Design a protein with these regions (language model features):
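Glycine-rich phosphate-binding loop and adjoining helix at the ATP-binding site
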Residues: 5-17, 21, 29-34, 41-100
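Amphipathic alpha-helical linker/stalk segments
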Residues: 2, 24-25
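Short glycine-rich anion-binding loops that position phosphate/pyrophosphate groups of nucleotides
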Residues: 39-42, 107-109
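Surface-exposed helix-capping loop/turn segments at secondary-structure junctions
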Residues: 25-30, 162
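Glycine/GP-enriched mid-protein hinge/lid loop-to-helix segment characteristic of carbohydrate kinases
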Residues: 4, 8-9, 69-71, 77-79, ...
Length: 169
């Protein structure tokens, strides 16, 4: 199921509702919880997006934890997608066996994660390693280096349409 992020936070939430309902219909026992891995800066205690790039309209302020717990009556946890990728690398991937892992992802945005002794390091105000949002030369880092922006720049330099380069991202 495509996210269709351009439709905004409410549309994404509706898709999450549909996915959870479908999954609940397929399993014999009631699920014991829901975990959401999402783009944006996440307040993990509240389970809410406190900042998101403009790629997803009306995403900042989404209260995933509250809305999902209210609807499905089971616990919900929400974490940044790059932090989840960092945990996966730490537990099963290239960082397995290390005490500290620094993870960098490059996709539609640029994200970072620090895992120390098996735990996500969230830092001050849940913003540790949010490298994509670092301010650089009147812009943020992900605007300067994200795959989508690099694709646009390459297509401009080559005088070609972005469509030709989209499959590369």
């Amino acid at each position: 199921m495509k996210t269709e992020a351009e439709k905004g936070g409410s549309a994404i939430l509706e898709k999450v509702f549909v996915i959870v309902e479908k999954l609940q219909g397929r399993i014999q026992e009631k699920a014991s919880g829901i975990c959401i891995s999402t783009a944006g800066m996440v307040n993990t205690e509240q389970g809410a997006i406190f900042y998101s790039a403009p790629l997803i309209p009306n995403y900042t302020g989404m209260q995933f934890k509250k809305l999902l717990e209210d609807k499905f009556k089971i616990p919900c946890e929400v974490e940044n997608d790059v932090n989840c990728a960092g945990l996966a690398e730490y537990r099963s991937g290239a960082a397995k066996g290390s005490h500290v892992a620094l993870i960098l992802t490059i996709g539609t945005g640029i994200g970072g994660s620090i895992i120390m002794d098996g735990e996500v390091y969230h830092g001050f105000s849940n913003s540790a390693c949010e490298v994509g949002y670092m301010h650089m030369n009147d812009s943020d880092f992900q605007t300067l280096g994200a795959a989508s922006i690099l694709t646009k720049k390459v297509s401009e330099w080559k005088g070609e349409t972005e469509k030709k380069w989209e499959r590369m991202t």
